[in-house]
Amino acid sequence: MRAPSFPERGTVKSETKAAAKGGITTLFEMPISNPCMSNAAEFASRKKHFLENTYINFAFIPALGKLTDLNLQNLVNSGAIAFKVFTIAPPPNRKSEFDGLCFTTEEKILKALKHAKKSNLITIFHAEDQLMLDSHKQYENKYKKNDPKVHNATRPILAEASARIGRVAL
C-alpha cells in the first residue's frame, strides 16, 4: 500500500476494505513508502496509521535500514515479522522510499544477510541482477514511457533467475 504516502494509489481504508470483501483477513505490509520503513520511528508511525484505518489484521516487514545492532533490535522489538532486501538500486528520484532497503553488490548483500541473521527472522528478497538491468536499460527507448512492454524489455526474466542463484550461493 505504501501508506500513508501515495493515497492516490489507495489508502489503508480503501485497500483493507477491498481485501476484507474478498475474504483476505491479514496483510503483510512491505517497507516501501516515503520515507522507507527502515527504523523504529517510521515503523511506529506506520503502525499508528494502520491501527487507526485498517479493516483487517496486518503485520510489517521493514527494510534492514542502518546495519547497527540497535536499529535491528528496535525493529524486532517494534514487531517486525521479517525483513525485506532489494538487490537493485533504487529508482531515480525515489531514494527516500528505498533508504536502507537496497544492497547491490555481493559484499553488501552478504553483510546485510549476516546482520539480519542476528534477528532470527526471515529475510525476503526482491532479487534482480543490477548489472543485467543496467545492460538492458538501452531497450527502454524503443517504447513509449508508459508502455507495459518496456518492463519485460528492460527487466528480463534472466535478471531475476541470475540474482536468485546468487542469493542461494550466499
Each model region followed by its residue ranges:
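Hydrophobic faces of well-ordered beta-strands that scaffold small-molecule active sites
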Residues: 1, 27-29, 58-62, 81-85, ...
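Active-site mouth loops of central-metabolism enzymes
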Residues: 1-10, 56-68, 98-102, 153-158
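Metal-associated gating/positioning segment near the N- to mid-region
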Residues: 1-53
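Short, acidic/polar
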Residues: 8-16, 66-75, 166
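Residue-level recognition of alpha-helix initiation/capping sites
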Residues: 9-10, 41, 66, 107, ...
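Structured loop/turn residues at beta-strand edges in well-structured enzyme cores
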Residues: 22, 56, 78-81
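A generic structural signal for alpha->beta connector loops
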Residues: 24, 55-57, 120
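Histidine/acidic residue-rich metal-binding segments in metalloenzymes
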Residues: 70-85, 89-170
